[in-house]
């Protein structure tokens, strides 16, 4: 019995199944927005035990812009010295760079899963708990849970470029502690 036609049919079905069911379009959680072609995930540059990623920049129909970051803990655990693990993130904050200011930010949101969002009114505070860091930051008071991604959103009035060298801080448990790192964030206005 010649199995070649059967193998070819099975292979064709497998390829079609992967194409049809292997990819899914993510739903648009805000029907007043459209995807901006400037989106490009960018991870942290240095010094954070957490993975901070600029997930997307969205141009909204009302001419505002939504920036979404995610944070995850790639080595969740107790943070005990020598364990190779990191405690859950408690909170983190970003500086606004040299071109953006707090008056350009309409509101912020945090989400433990990217689905349910809690809005907050962003404000700038001077960070004093991280040794050697004294820059004003916008804090996100939501952390991470194990290795799950948490999401953070800021809606701004102006179209801003992206810069890879924004200063940021993280706060964790007593064993992992706090620190400063560099990440992708607000650059200067673009057309």
Residue positions per predicted region:
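Bacterial signal peptide processing site
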Residues: 24-26
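Extracellular or exported targeting regions of proteins
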Residues: 29-191
């Amino acid at each position: 019995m010649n199995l070649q036609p059967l193998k070819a049919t099975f292979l064709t079905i497998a390829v079609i199944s992967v194409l049809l069911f292997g990819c899914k379009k993510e739903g648009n959680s805000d029907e007043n927005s459209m995807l901006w072609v400037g989106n490009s995930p960018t991870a942290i540059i240095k010094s954070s035990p957490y993975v901070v990623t600029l997930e997307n920049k969205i141009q909204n129909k009302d001419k505002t812009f939504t920036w979404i970051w995610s944070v995850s803990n790639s080595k969740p655990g107790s943070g005990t010295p020598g364990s190779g693990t990191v405690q859950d993130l408690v909170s983190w904050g970003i500086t606004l760079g040299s071109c953006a200011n707090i008056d350009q930010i309409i509101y912020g949101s945090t989400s433990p899963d990217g689905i349910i969002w809690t809005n907050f009114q962003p404000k700038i505070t001077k960070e004093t708990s991280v040794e050697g860091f004294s820059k004003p930051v916008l804090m996100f008071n939501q952390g991470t849970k194990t290795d799950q991604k948490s999401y953070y959103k800021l809606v701004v009035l102006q179209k801003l470029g992206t810069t890879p060298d924004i200063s940021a801080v993280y706060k964790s448990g007593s064993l992992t502690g706090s620190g400063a790192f560099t990440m992708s964030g607000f650059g200067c206005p673009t057309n």
